[in-house]
Amino acid sequence: MYYQNQHQGKNILSSSRMHITSERHPFLRGNSPGDSGLILSTDAKPRLKWTPDLHERFIEAVNQLGGADKATPKTIMKVMGIPGLTLYHLKSHLQKYRLSKNLNGQANNSFNKIGIMTMMEEKTPDADEIQSENLSIGPQPNKNSPIGEALQMQIEVQRRLHEQLEVQRHLQLRIEAQGKYLQSVLEKAQETLGRQNLGAAGIEAAKVQLSELVSKVSAEYPNSSFLEPKELQNLCSQQMQTNYPPDCSLESCLTSSEGTQKNSKMLENNRLGLRTYIGDSTSEQKEIMEEPLFQRMELTWTEGLRGNPYLSTMVSEAEQRISYSERSPGRLSIGVGLHGHKSQHQQGNNEDHKLETRNRKGMDSTTELDLNTHVENYCTTRTKQFDLNGFSWN
């Protein structure tokens, strides 16, 4: 029993050793001993183990064909004539051979260069140092020439960039200056528009004041006719288109109304006992241009021998005028004169005295509007005519 168990154990060990040896040697020789020593693996895709003898025969075939660059797997297989070799085996081995040869060639070249340099250093004595320096200095310009060209190109590029930056900065400054100029122009335009708006507002205020005065006077004297501001504006536009220079002021509108409504005014003047002065318009315009002072119209309301003959036409004093008119509604006179001339003020007072004497004689029932009372003294003094070109609201 013991002998049998020992024998079985030996068999198991021997079988295990055989299995290990078979695993350790995966490449097996061909079936026949005359296969030229090819060792193939037992895989599904068998691989060839290149032995030194097989590799030498491969190198001989490659050299016969003219080198690794000219040799091909088919020609190598024909030259070698070993059965069992395939194109797959030869192709992979040829690629490896070419790579190794190129690497060896590069390494040999480097080794050769190093060896030559060491030999040159060993052979150069002290007497030949000048020649060696000349030889070393000679090829330096060729080596440094690409570097110098690159530096010059870089310097040129930097110079051009600097010029472009200068041009851009100059353009930026010009753009900023142009923007400031446009801003100043816009500010000036806004200021002028604001002034024009203020002027229009003043004209509107003057129109409102005039309409209030007309309404109050027309309420007291319904027989007397006054022009509305709209009619005055229409007459002003007609006057600008026909005869007079372009003046959109309220005074020019009032003066233009006399020429356009002459016939209707004649009837009204005859009915109210109004006396008008018929003069030359050109002479009137010349006198207006020659006069440097500012003319103003003053409405005067007189009561007997008392009262101020010249009152301003502000809206705040309208009530005072109405109170005077209520006391003496039959004594209405309009005096036109220049401020600063005492003689003209005295003449206006004389006119008021004349009107009072006429009213005492029996003319109190009618309203007399005297527009020009100094016709007889035209040669000695300046004529006083109903001219509203110098009229303004203060």
Curated annotation (Swiss-Prot):
Changing residue 72 to E: In isoform 1; partial localization to one or more nuclear spots. In isoform 3; increased localization to nuclear spots. Residues 338-363 are annotated as: Disordered. Keywords: Coiled coil, DNA-binding, Nucleus, Transcription, Transcription regulation. Residues 148-168 are annotated as: Coiled coil. GO terms for cellular component: nucleus. The gene is MYR2. Belongs to the MYB-CC family. The lineage of its organism: Eukaryota, Viridiplantae, Streptophyta, Embryophyta, Tracheophyta. Disruption phenotype: No visible phenotype when grown under long days conditions, but early flowering when grown under short days conditions. SUPFAM superfamilies: Homeodomain-like. Residues 73-98 bind DNA. Disulfide bonds: none annotated. Expressed in phloem and/or cambium. This is Myb-related protein 2.
